[in-house]
Amino acid sequence: MTRTAKLTIIPPGKPLSGRAMPPGSKSITNRALLLAGLAKGTSRLTGALKSDDTRYMADALRAMGVSIDEPDDTTFVVTGSGRLQPPKAPLFLGNAGTATRFLTAAAALVDGTVVVDGDEHMRKRPIGPLVEAMRTLGIDVTAETGCPPVTVKGTGRFQADRIRIDGGLSSQYVSALLMMAAGGDRPFDIELVGEDIGALGYIDLTTAAMKAFGAKVEKTSPVTWRVEPTGYRAADFIVEPDASAATYLWAAEVLTGGAIDLGVPSDAFSQPDARAYDMIARFPQLPAEIDGSQMQDAVPTLAVLAAFNETPVRFVGIANLRVKECDRIRALSSGLNRIRPGLAREEGDDLIVKSDPALVGKRLPAEIDSFADHRIAMSFALAGLKIDGITILDPDCVGKTFPAYWRTLAALGVTYQDKD
């Protein structure tokens, strides 16, 4: 399939109104897929996301002996034997961070060798802290560059009963270890250490999903979890809509003064990015400082929205954005300054958006490099709702988590000019 090279958003000039359902949560779908694959029996996942990231996870599980059927666009029927099998070839996971981190840890439960690999972007994303944590359990795991590819020689047995890991690193490392732990041979504790504990909400998502599949996991302190070696049992599981995807629709609503029905109230989400709703609702009076540490995937949405705010906004607690699909702090600063020089700047790992409500209605031709990052592409599309001339490069990258994004905006009244 030919990819669209660029897409120019035509400002609608009117409020966006209608019904627009966000897709299923990527974070929850990939957790549920792995847990269902580790379980013995047949699980049915409904409301699931079908996207690049979840297909990489599903295909990897198939390569490890799990049967996965897809009877419709939002359902996975997963049948596992209770133990993953060694794949015959390396697992290729593109640039799917959740799949890569989760399967690296899960590979320790395989009786054999598993190589976890990805594309050129994933090969630049760090995984060393997870590798080091696994080694403390006696697991034979190597990642020569500190990034994928990772080779895991699993046995399903651990030589320690406690892991201490820096809580300021990616929460995906912690989630990966937690999900692995229930399939091990002994109870053990996972403790976060350090001054900055980030994205605890995503760890809560993980433990909730684990419990739904029969695991016994207990939070014994604000930063410690104890996991019993229960394994997992098959379950029917409903995936809630994606809160990160919802942020684009909430922002489109306030930017255009529209009324968009997402089909689910903002307080129905359990995902941490739903916290952004209260911020978005304050537009154009966003706070002077926004801590993005507990809603990291919502920061690009908020940063672009901040460009139209009445006063400047500083984003803090976002250092981990530098090691996402791209350096999102740099990408946001670069893109905003393409729209108007001086609109944003980096200060250490903070992002400062100076804000300029006068941007609304102007023609400011700007090609925005998405850096093949779905969240950069979707966020800067919001700028195109109010500024004439915004062009997104590599718009098809939204297929990573929200394949219908451009169609969803079109159904609300947005039009485009594309160029292959």
UniProtKB/Swiss-Prot annotation:
Catalysed reactions, semicolon-separated: 3-phosphoshikimate + phosphoenolpyruvate = 5-O-(1-carboxyvinyl)-3-phosphoshikimate + phosphate
Listed binding positions for 3-phosphoshikimate are K26, S27, R31, S170, S171, Q172, D297, N320, K324
So where's the catalytic machinery, residue-wise? D297
Q: Name one GO biological process term.
A: amino acid biosynthetic process
The highest taxon in the source lineage is Bacteria
InterPro entries in the record: Enolpyruvate_Tfrase_dom, Enolpyruvate_Tfrase_sf, EPSP_synthase, EPSP_synthase_CS, RNA3'P_cycl/enolpyr_Trfase_a/b
Q: In which pathway does this enzyme or protein participate?
A: Metabolic intermediate biosynthesis; chorismate biosynthesis; chorismate from D-erythrose 4-phosphate and phosphoenolpyruvate: step 6/7
- SUPFAM superfamilies xrefs: EPT/RTPC-like
Places the protein is found = Cytoplasm
Spell out the disulfide connections: none
As recorded in UniProt, its EC number(s) are 2.5.1.19
Q: Do the record's keywords include Endoplasmic reticulum?
A: no
Where, by residue number, does phosphoenolpyruvate bind?
K26, G97, R125, Q172, R328, R375, K400
Entry similarity comment: Belongs to the EPSP synthase family.
What protein name does the entry list? Answer: 3-phosphoshikimate 1-carboxyvinyltransferase
Could you tell me which species this protein originates from?
Rhizobium leguminosarum bv. trifolii (strain WSM2304)
Taxonomy of the source species: Bacteria, Pseudomonadati, Pseudomonadota, Alphaproteobacteria, Hyphomicrobiales
